[in-house]
Amino acid sequence: MSLSTKLAITDVDLKGKNVLIRVDFNVPLDGDRITNNARIVGALPTIKYALEQQPKAVILMSHLGRPNGARVAKYSLKPVAAELSKLLGKPVKFLDDCVGPEVEKACKEAKGGEVILLENLRFHIEEEGSAKVDGKKVKADASAVEAFRKSLTSLGDIFVNDAFGTAHRAHSSMVGVDLPRVSGFLMKKELDYFSKALENPARPFLAILGGAKVADKIQLIDNLLDKVNRLIICGGMAFTFLKVLNGMKIGDSLFDEAGSKNVESMMAKAKKNNVEVFLPVDFVTADKFDKDAKVGSATAEEGIPDGWMGLDCGPKSSAKFAEVITTSKTIVWNGPAGVFEFDNFAKGTKSMLDACVKTCEAGNVVIVGGGDTATVAKKYGKEDALSHVSTGGGASLELLEGKALPGVVALSSK
């Protein structure tokens, strides 16, 4: 899908209007205390820009956690209102619902660029369209979903979607607001980077894929093999490739039985498309999956003995991967090279990160998919040293898999 044809917040006039913004304020809470406010900070450029345009009001809506279509006090967005007020340096009015006559009245009467935060969208089953009751999936009533969407629509004159993290969900607040729909700055930044990589990358284009299971990445690998020039396969899933392709002894390392059936066809596609594939040639091993495990080493040639497992790639692999990274122009990285949470098995991932930072400094583009790889960048304080660290794990993965994201499709075209 082309992402460059959608309207952005800067393409529309917000003066005197109620600007309804779908943000991602799904922040971690410890009681009433927000333990990481990064997602609130991420939405500030869009909120501040909207306020500068002299709107009637800025109305913010978000989900938090998984309250499963019911009102659950610990998932209230009320603590977020206080934090946002502090960050904006102006009052934020918190409403204790997100739809209904009282909310509609408060938004209608708002004036002078007032900032309003609505209560958690997911307190209503109509937001996600279903909920789990006693382990069974219960669907929301279609007419109730329609009424919920109608009430949300009535709150604004223009709808801004800045919640990339939920763009892969066809939820009411993402696709059901019947207003002109534009992207906010965070959403636009995500889409710009991914469209640059997927539609018009500087080459050589490298994808680095790590993580545990091949089966989880089949669609991703298949789509990227039509786009990239180079592919590094690392992390736990490398063992499945090495065992299938070279008959390598992998000891107690991860082996993905389901994913293994696709290895040969993927390699055949890589060969057909002239994609160079790089696999680890040596490993840091452990006698158990534990941060205090005994540490050993092994090569792909010798194999890993029984009773041992590979938890990281070794120094030769790291050196080769660094060379591939620093000679590529566009890099998409999804999945770590080893169990970086354990210090003894973090070197491969850290080496990869260092190479990515170095190639960025040389003017190349490095995009980090959300999830674990974003955690790696954060752990080592390198988020700002990379071109782009995605805020959406699931959403970025689905984009890279070639899927259309409902929240993006729903944006108005230029």
UniProtKB/Swiss-Prot annotation:
Its cofactor is Mg(2+). GO terms for molecular function: ADP binding; ATP binding; metal ion binding; phosphoglycerate kinase activity. The modification Phosphothreonine is found at T299, T373. It is found in: Cytoplasm; Mitochondrion. CDP binds at G211, D216, G235, G335, A337, F340. It comes from the Eukaryota. ATP binds at A212, K217, G236, G310, E341, D372, T373. Mg(2+) binds at A212, A215, D216, D372. It is an enzyme of class 2 (transferase). (2R)-3-phosphoglycerate binds at V23, D24, F25, N26, R39, S62, H63, G65, R66, L121, R122, H168, R169. GO terms for cellular component: cytosol; mitochondrion; nucleus. Transmembrane segments: none annotated. Its EC number is 2.7.2.3. Its main location: cytoplasm. The modification Phosphotyrosine is found at Y75. Catalyzes one of the two ATP producing reactions in the glycolytic pathway via the reversible conversion of 1,3-diphosphoglycerate to 3-phosphoglycerate. Both L- and D- forms of purine and pyrimidine nucleotides can be used as substrates, but the activity is much lower on pyrimidines. Negatively regulates the biosynthesis of acetyl-CoA from pyruvate in the mitochondrion. Monomer. This is Phosphoglycerate kinase. It comes from Schizosaccharomyces pombe (strain 972 / ATCC 24843) (Fission yeast). The gene is pgk1.
